[in-house]
Amino acid sequence: MTPLILLHGIGTGPGAWGPQIEALSPEREVVAPDLVGAYASGWEAAVEEVRRLTNQHREVDLCGLSLGGLIALQIAAERSEAGERLIVCAAFRGLPPGLRRRVHAMAMLTRLMPRGFLHRQLVAEIPQPYRNRALAEIAPLGPGKLARLMRQAASARIDTKSIAARALVLCGDRDEANLRLARDLASGLPGSTFALVPEAGHVANLDNAEAFTGLVAEFLAS
């Protein structure tokens, strides 16, 4: 069976995929790489890390949250395997200029934040017991490195027309900052399915793990 690779976002580590690994691994190989070190090295390093991982397989299914979703989109755009499947949550194909400028301004402020305060802000919306683990996992990501990554990710644009994989686009129904972007992404992926994760915010796979995992499992089985 095609392996499933789970890609975490900026404010979490691979431990945030615990509920999905537990639920999905009996049926298939599930891999959740630690991308924090790659994130600390920048966008290209993170993409290359995932590229190396996916190149070990003829076919892979990708599931990414937030920045992990953006990387999943980039990798899917580079691969031509039509039998693969792609699941992204709280991701986008490109930020509008105004929002991109806003993220760049936020990145400038991020550089000035004390490391401990920044990390606590990053994990603030993650439910326990995963919050404390995420706080430990993101330790290598300092303010300067995070600011650079924010600028680079905000400038990324994905050629969705190059994506052959069947796609499921998700977003937490309470993730107001990303709802419009997620819908726009789905509209740019021909034949994709869009679904809201009920009672979930940005970290939808933990906010409502049962609903998120159910949507993913149903899509993979279809």
Language-model features: where?
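Flexible "cap/lid" loop of the alpha/beta hydrolase fold
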Residues: 77-78, 83-113
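Catalytic histidine-centered segment of alpha/beta-hydrolase-like enzymes
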Residues: 200-213
